[in-house]
Amino acid sequence: AMNLIHKGETQLLEANTLNGGQLRIAASDTICRYFLVPYLNKFHKLYPNVHIKVTNSTSIECAHILENGQVDFIITNYPNSGLLNTHSVRAIREFRDVFVASAEHFPLQDKTFTLTELLDYPIMMLDRKSTTSEFLHSMFQKSHLDLVPEIELSSNDLLIDLARIGLGIAFVPNFCIPEDEKQLFILKLSETLPVRQLVVVHNENLPVSQAAKQFMDML
């Protein structure tokens, strides 16, 4: 509660100026690296006196951080089980998740897979604390399948590195795959996985600072 009171007082003082104050954002490592950095760069050039604080955590944990009033807003994957009714959600882009494998170690470029057939291969994915894990497990559960990953990590980049050396088939957002990728290929599926979204979320119960408004308007 004291966090929320202090935050409200600070935002009132900063309401009409961007000559100081702070901007507090939470996002996952993947979203920070592949989406957020260019916007942070632009905002910092426009408003160099605003102190920017970025908190790195899983998308689910980011929702809890937002609810506690520790940040102005979060950028997260959606759906996200951590989001509450008090959270205002706006979509900013869509993306697809893909299974990728090394062509050298898994020469399967011509094969089209069902989810059932994928279970015959070592699947690598983010750990259970992530929205990506929630999403993939729910897809398998809808088909009455039990997914038991070979490897669970907290980094999409590391999953991609392990896929390149043939340790398994990695499940990652498509925007993590370099455009000039030569070692990995995207597996073809007989079932189309739903599109997910990146969303910006703020707590409707808290005042939004001028800095946060300006940044969210850039997205």
Language-model segment annotations:
Residues 107-108, 121-143, 208-216:
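Secondary-structure junction motif
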Residues 35, 186-219:
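A late-sequence structural motif
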Residues 1-14, 98:
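Alpha-helical "hinge/linker" immediately C-terminal to small N-terminal DNA-binding modules
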Residues 20-83, 152-153:
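Central regulatory/effector-binding core of bacterial HTH transcription factors
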Residues 58-71, 77, 131-187:
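Hydrophobic hinge/microswitch elements
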Residues 22-26, 74, 124, 170, ...:
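Short, well-ordered beta-strand segments
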Residues 88-98, 174, 182-197:
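Short beta-strand->loop
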Residues 16, 86-123:
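Flexible hinge/capping segments at coil-to-helix
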